[in-house]
Amino acid sequence: MQFYLKILAFFILLFSSVSADDKNFENKWSLYTGTFDFSDEGAKSTLYGVQYINLNNHYDSFLGKLYPVTGFFLTVDNAKYIYKGFQTTYDKGSFNITPSFTPGLYDKGNGKDLRHVIEFKTEIQISYNISKKSEIALSYNHISNANLGDNNPGANSYMFNYIKKF
């Protein structure tokens, strides 16, 4: 229960600075599903997730514009990962390539033990613009504790995403 309260507080803080009066308000929501740790036959599990991308708040860097990303996923084995980080998008016409880096908190539930509560997710996503406000995508990520734990088993996952701009 305490984990869910932390998630609720996290999203309340995230959206508390958002103003409905902002005429240029634009963001994306991504709903996704896929296979968590597909490369470990004994630990793979279906996952479901949601991600928020704030397009109004970006940081210019040598990589391009970095947009804040916040998300959460849950596996059918009750493993949970809540994260906040950044992504950049490289527009290639109808296609987009989007790498991201999102540190977060992981709870194994009845799923794979990643050996530390702090984990780092690196991801690459390829999306196709089906309209001006919608995309479908395929993404791959790796989650690792970067040797913070006594062991670093990691997890590789792939997802199918539906992304909607509001």
Locate the predicted segments by residue.
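Residue-level signature of outer-membrane beta-barrel architecture
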Residues: 52-54, 74, 88-90, 128, ...
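Outer-membrane beta-barrel initiation region
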Residues: 20-57
